[in-house]
Each structure stands twice: as C-alpha cells, then as structure tokens.
Amino acid sequence: MAELEFEKPVVELRNKIRELKEYTKHSQMDFSEEIRILEDKLENLEEEIYGNMKVWDRVQIARHAERPTTLDYIEHLFTDFFECHGDRFFGDDAAIVGGIAKYNGMPVTVIGHQRGKDTKENIRRNFGMPHPEGYRKALRLMKQAEKFNRPIICFIDTKGAYPGKAAEERGQSEAIARNLFEMAGLTVPVICIVIGEGGSGGALGLGVGDYIYMLENSTYSVISPEGAATILWKDATKARDAAEALKITAADLKELGVIDEIIPESRGGAHRNILKQSENINVVLQKTFEQLSGISKDELIEKRYEKYMKIGQVSFSNASIWVK
C-alpha cells in the first residue's frame, strides 16, 4: 500500500511489528512482550498523527491512488447494477459511470465520477476528468430516473471537468450548467456524496441534491490548491498555503453550511478498510432515505431550493450598512 509523506513514522513502525511477528514464527524466542509494547506505541502514534492532520494531509489522502472509487462503492453497497452508456449526442465518457441498481431491494439510479486504478485505466477514464458527453450521459440517466420515480445517488470524485479544446468545442460549460439547472428541479430524491476530490464545476455537475455529504478526508473546492497558488502567488509550490485558505475540508464546509454531514473514515483513510467505509456510507444512506420518505414532489423541490438559497448568506446583525 502506497504511503504518504506525513504517515511515514506510522508505516515504519507497522513494518517493524510485522517483521518481528514474522521472525517470531521461525524462532524459539518469545517476543510477545516486545510486540505488545510496539503495538501500544503504534496505537498512540496513529492517534497523534491521524488525529492532528493538517489540511494538506487530507488533500493527500483524498488523492490517494488506492482510495476507493465509485465502482468500488457500487460493488459493496448495491446489487444488480446495470451500467448504461452514452449520451445519445456524441459518445460515451468513461470518466463518469452510471446505471440502474438496487439498494436494499429498492430500485435506484447510481452515477459517479470514475478514475482509474492504474496508468492504463486512468488514460481510458481520462483520470476521472469528464468531457461534456459524460455530464450529458449523467443527465440522461437522471431524467430516466425521474420518469420511473427512482432516487438518484451521486458519487463525486474528480479534479475537475476536462479543460481540453475538444471538450470546450462540444460545450463543456453548457453541459455542466444544464446539469445544475435540471438537477435543481428533479422530482425524485437526489443524494450526493463527495468520496475523494470535489473539484470545481466538474464536481458541481453531479453535486446538486437534497443532501450533500462528504467523507471525512475528502475535499470540495472551486479550484485545486495548486491552481489557486498559481493564480494568487504565481507559485504552485505554495499549494499548502492555498489549501488552508480555500476552506476545502469536510469540517470547514460543514461549518460553512455547504454540506449536511461528514461521513467518518477509518483511521488513515477510506483505503485502509473499504468494507468499513462502505458500512459508514450505508448507515448515512439508510438514515437519509428514512428522512426523505413521505415527502411530496413539490415539497422536495421547495426544500432543495431553500437549501441552496441559504448557502453563502452573510449575516449583518453586528454591522452597520450605509446606502447612499
């Protein structure tokens, strides 16, 4: 498993314990007490490092090469998944996957960004950066879900929409804007979960819903830290400072009222235990569907509208405003 810079002390101690256990198997000496001491030390070290992570540490975890993807969660949370392809205008975009599935026996539509697990797959999926046809495919599936009264679950995990010339020529901005407009008025429940990086408009194209959740170590921002640093300071190496300033973590966005709830992760990140992470997501999904049950279509749209109108409101209760 790939290690991140800030967690090297944990990895080194974990490896030392594993080596000692392996040596014990082939030795007549008893190292059980030494192993116990090291395991206690590891527990304290993990609590210290993972319990005091900086924003940049969370950015690294959100980008981890082994972090679970949309298809991983589909496999663990849903049954009878049938993937649908194509936008019926131009083509199919592998950077967004979507289809019909069952959640606890209930028909649902599942859509999400999909990055690759290796170089070959990343190239095929364009590193999880969708083209316009990806967003149009997603919208086609959303409208289909609305027609057949299926709830929609969106998994968000992208650095951003692909900014290439061909994507712009095929209407990248229009495709994203159309999704925002249409998702706001869907008459079926929409649940959005940021599972990795939530980058700019590319994330928003799947991010308008009745409930917005973020995994504990995911990020959600208008621009990448590197991009912000380049614009503000003409220096991409100041990405750490930009990450702090952007307020991109789940805790920041919960405090700002942008998201509804934080889904906890296993210590060290979701990639450490995908089964446990899927269980954590499942708990939230079950609770959310209970909250959404019995709500009429008109009330659903009204509550969604009110939700987004509250985001970004500024209180002037302690300030004087002079208008000339």
From Swiss-Prot:
Top EC group: transferase
GO MF terms, alphabetically ordered: acetyl-CoA carboxylase activity; ATP binding; carboxyl- or carbamoyltransferase activity
Catalytic function, reaction form: N(6)-carboxybiotinyl-L-lysyl-[protein] + acetyl-CoA = N(6)-biotinyl-L-lysyl-[protein] + malonyl-CoA
Protein EC: 2.1.3.15
Protein location: Cytoplasm
Transmembrane segments: none
Domain (CoA carboxyltransferase C-terminal): residue spans on this chain: 37-291
The keyword Cytoplasm is assigned to this record: yes
GO biological process: fatty acid biosynthetic process; malonyl-CoA biosynthetic process
Pathway: Lipid metabolism; malonyl-CoA biosynthesis; malonyl-CoA from acetyl-CoA: step 1/1
Keyword tags: ATP-binding, Cytoplasm, Fatty acid biosynthesis, Fatty acid metabolism, Lipid biosynthesis, Lipid metabolism, Nucleotide-binding, Transferase
One of the record's GO cellular component terms: acetyl-CoA carboxylase complex
Complex formation: Acetyl-CoA carboxylase is a heterohexamer composed of biotin carboxyl carrier protein (AccB), biotin carboxylase (AccC) and two subunits each of ACCase subunit alpha (AccA) and ACCase subunit beta (AccD).
Family: Belongs to the AccA family.
Function in brief: Component of the acetyl coenzyme A carboxylase (ACC) complex. First, biotin carboxylase catalyzes the carboxylation of biotin on its carrier protein (BCCP) and then the CO(2) group is transferred by the carboxyltransferase to acetyl-CoA to form malonyl-CoA.
Name of protein: Acetyl-coenzyme A carboxylase carboxyl transferase subunit alpha
Lineage summary: Bacteria, Bacillati, Bacillota, Bacilli, Bacillales
Gene: accA
